[in-house]
Amino acid sequence: EIASCLVGSEMCIRDRLGAPLGHDFTVISLSDLLTPWELIERRLAAAAEGDFAICLYNPSSHKRHDYLQKACQILLQKKSGDTICGITRNIGRDGEEKRILTLDELLETQVDMFTTVFIGNSQTRKVGDAMVTPRGYRRDNA
């Protein structure tokens, strides 16, 4: 049996953060164990250039404690510091946490391997305590 981790994760976060991946999005792992960091950097830059909402897995570890900050610096070359972001930690476990913040704030945030990070696109908004990326770019689709 094959189970999709992305679908499971997206379903878990939907109720936690709102609708962070409502339009085109990409999922990028920051782990360089099997993928060279240079390729991860290119993928981050391309996702930012394309105005994708982004989901980041494996954002940090003991050996890669600064990779999220490196990723944020790459994204800030094309995305506004006010871009809405969200983090979830320990989804479905004791101590579950969520937080909505800006890309500038995310740059200064420490996370671990139990954290999933979401970076919105140019249309993503904070609505109450939810992160919402509308399905279309026209304002009447929000």
What label would you give each PLM region?
Residues E1-C12:
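Single conserved hydrophobic/aromatic residue that forms the stacking wall/gate
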Residues A19, H23-A48, K63-A71:
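Anionic-ligand binding region
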Residues S4, L21-H23, I87-T88:
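General beta-strand structural signal in soluble alpha/beta enzymes
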Residues A3, L44-A45, E108-T109:
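Short secondary-structure boundary/capping segments
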Residues E49-A142:
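A contiguous loop/helix-start segment that scaffolds small-molecule binding in enzyme catalytic cores
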Residues I13-R14, A71:
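Hydrophobic packing residues within well-ordered alpha-helices of enzyme cores
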Residues R16-A19, E41-L44, K98-D104:
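Short, surface-exposed amphipathic charged segments that create phosphate/polyanion-binding patches used
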